């Protein structure tokens, strides 16, 4: 699940199938993440607002969440479960392993918590153009090379409020199946946010 807000927050999440013992437990009781995500994108003005809400909400499942703040040029990765939540930046990013090294001023996660091949390939693609990564580079050389985003890929330029998005092929469509191999559309969210609602 992904989203972008008019307060220059970008958010993404992925379910965790390969947790380690640092995750804590899951529960069927709590606020479903779709509503957590909507609240954050609708009401949070800053990264701190979003993190505070996540810390206090009745969480349910294992997720990895990324939230970036275009106003502050910073981001956090969040280890999210019913009984535990942990917030990571570039200095304490987890899981810390040879296959998931830390990168100054960056947080990243590839496909799952314990997923060495995706994590390391993502690390390689980020560091190949470190400091010069553009949305176009991300689309052509990160998501497509790492092969992450079968169903959906969203790339945010939070400083310019531009969203690039691709979706996997529907059953009645032709062309590549995976979203990362398909055509991206570019949306100027400044225009979208300025639209007058009917």
Task: Give each language-model segment a name.
Residues 41-198:
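C-terminus-biased signal that marks the final domain/tail of proteins
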């Amino acid at each position: 699940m992904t989203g972008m807000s008019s307060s220059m927050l970008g958010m993404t999440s992925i379910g965790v199938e390969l947790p380690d013992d640092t995750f804590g437990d899951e529960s069927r009781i709590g606020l479903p993440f779709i509503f957590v995500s909507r609240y954050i994108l609708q009401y949070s003005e800053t990264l701190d607002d979003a993190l505070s809400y996540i810390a206090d909400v009745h969480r349910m499942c294992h997720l990895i969440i990324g939230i970036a703040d275009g106003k502050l040029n910073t981001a956090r990765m969040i280890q999210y479960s019913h009984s535990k939540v942990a917030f990571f930046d570039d200095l304490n990013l987890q899981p810390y392993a040879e296959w998931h090294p830390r990168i100054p001023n960056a947080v990243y996660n590839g496909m799952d918590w314990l997923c060495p091949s995706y994590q390391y390939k993502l690390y390689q693609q980020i560091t190949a153009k470190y400091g010069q990564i553009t949305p176009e580079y991300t689309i052509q050389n990160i998501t497509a090379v790492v092969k992450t985003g079968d169903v959906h890929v969203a790339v945010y330029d939070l400083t310019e409020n531009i969203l690039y998005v691709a979706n996997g092929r529907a059953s009645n469509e032709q062309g590549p199946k995976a979203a990362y191999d398909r055509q991206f559309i570019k949306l100027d969210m400044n225009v979208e946010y300025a639209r007058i609602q009917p």
